[in-house]
Regions:
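Glycine-rich, acidic and aromatic/proline-enriched surface loops and short helix-turn segments
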Residues: 83, 87-102, 134-138, 182-186, ...
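A conserved hydrophobic secondary-structure block that centers on an alpha-helix together
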Residues: 100-137
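Long, well-ordered, tryptophan-enriched scaffold segments
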Residues: 178-181, 185-226
């Protein structure tokens, strides 16, 4: 119950809205404060009108589909859309399953991946990992298009376990080799060339003639496995529940140590991780149910000031409360540039590891960028500019 916490009702609701999206306006806060906290959580997880706004003006102002324009679409959606959590979870998966434009230079595949995260990001882990494993941007990013019988490429099989699901120390090199064999033949159709016809997406393609049909041993299981079998085994591992739930806690609740240190640094709140992993096992890895457990918990309600906003969160929150992105306009790319200047180039993370978060968002340069951006849109001078 709210009365058990040393915050007012509006403070608690504001905290929730900052974590599920980028905050809310005073009018929105007054409206949602009329219902119970548990009912608000239910509405956030299953909104009545998730697509109750139009984006047609993006096509009016921006004639092409570059990654910065789609970062702008994401920013507009999370501020104005009817399902901010869907947009927030898409960035969560983008951070965890980091895939960058700089290798492929093919924006449509990155756009397709972001839309895939929006579509499946609140479903279950098996569906999420299967969708990821069939995603052309990921297949190219981690070279699985070169993974064929007789010449296996272990890149995706390794990162699937190390960075995307289980974490370091929970599998063997033989597991990596057999996972790679299970994903042989998983590739994508060649997209239409960039010029002169423009950008076109590609699609998943399974080439049976390039798939290894041998008997395989993987994480204690044996069989003639394919990629889907490997994913089914992975999502039922206790290590996967712990790893994914710690990522969720780190993103929505409290900044943890950087991910490479997780195998030697214990979680800050083991009780919270246990609550989340229990929910993972009970719901077969359903992200919506895990988040329901998280948002309704006492430790979440008491987690104010424990999470340092990412650049995307900071810019989104500033624009939300100042009312500077209530309509689509050409200057939206300036906001995307501000996010990039603070150290987070959306759809173009620096490595497969994604971005280091928490305090590592801050250095001398990025701190100045943060302060200057917030002052630009929230100071008295900003009020004077808006009245001109």
């Amino acid at each position: 119950m709210i009365e058990n916490h040393s915050t007012t009702r509006q403070e608690l609701y504001s905290h929730l809205m900052r974590r599920v999206g980028v905050g809310c306006t005073l009018n929105e806060l007054e409206k949602i404060s009329k219902i119970s906290y548990e009912s608000l959580v239910d509405q956030i997880l299953s909104p009545e009108n998730p697509d109750s706004f139009q984006e047609d003006d993006f096509d009016r102002y921006f004639a092409h589909e570059g990654i910065d324009i789609w970062a702008g679409r994401w920013l507009y959606r999370i501020i104005n859309g009817g399902h901010p959590l869907r947009e927030k979870i898409s960035i969560f998966w983008h951070q965890l399953f980091a895939t960058a434009w700089f290798k492929s230079e093919h924006p449509n595949s990155l756009i397709h991946q972001l839309e895939m995260f929006r579509a499946v990001g609140l479903s279950d882990m098996k569906n999420i990992l299967l969708s990821l494993s069939k995603d052309p941007a990921m297949l190219f990013w981690l070279d699985n298009n070169d993974n064929i019988d007789g010449e296996p490429n272990e890149n995706y099989g390794r990162e699937l376990m190390e960075l995307f699901s289980m974490g370091v120390g929970n599998y063997t090199e033989n597991d990596v080799k057999n996972a790679a064999l299970a994903f042989t033949g998983w590739t994508f159709t060649q997209p239409i060339p960039l010029y002169p016809t423009g950008h076109y997406a590609s699609n998943f393609k399974y080439e049976e003639s390039r798939h290894n049909q041998d008997f395989k041993k993987f994480l204690g299981h044996s069989g003639n496995f394919n990629g889907e079998d490997v994913i089914d085994i992975i999502v039922h591992q206790p290590a996967t529940a712990n790893f994914i739930c710690r990522h969720i806690y780190n993103f929505f609740v409290e900044d943890e140590a950087q991910v490479p240190a997780w195998n030697i640094v214990a979680p800050k709140n083991p009780e919270a991780i246990k609550d989340l992993t229990d929910s993972y096992h009970k719901s077969n890895g359903n992200i919506t149910e895990i988040l329901r457990t998280l948002f309704n918990s006492d430790w979440f309600k008491n987690s104010k000031f424990k999470h340092l906003k990412s650049p995307a969160e900071l810019v989104g929150h500033t624009l939300k409360i100042s009312g500077n992105l209530r309509e689509i306009k050409p200057g939206i790319l300036d906001y995307v540039s501000a996010i990039t200047n603070m150290g987070q180039h959306l759809l173009n993370p620096p490595t497969v590891e994604g971005w280091h978060t928490g305090k590592e968002w801050i250095d001398g340069g990025t701190l100045n960028e943060r302060v200057n951006f917030c002052l630009l849109y929230t100071s008295d001078a900003a009020d004077e500019r808006s009245s001109v």
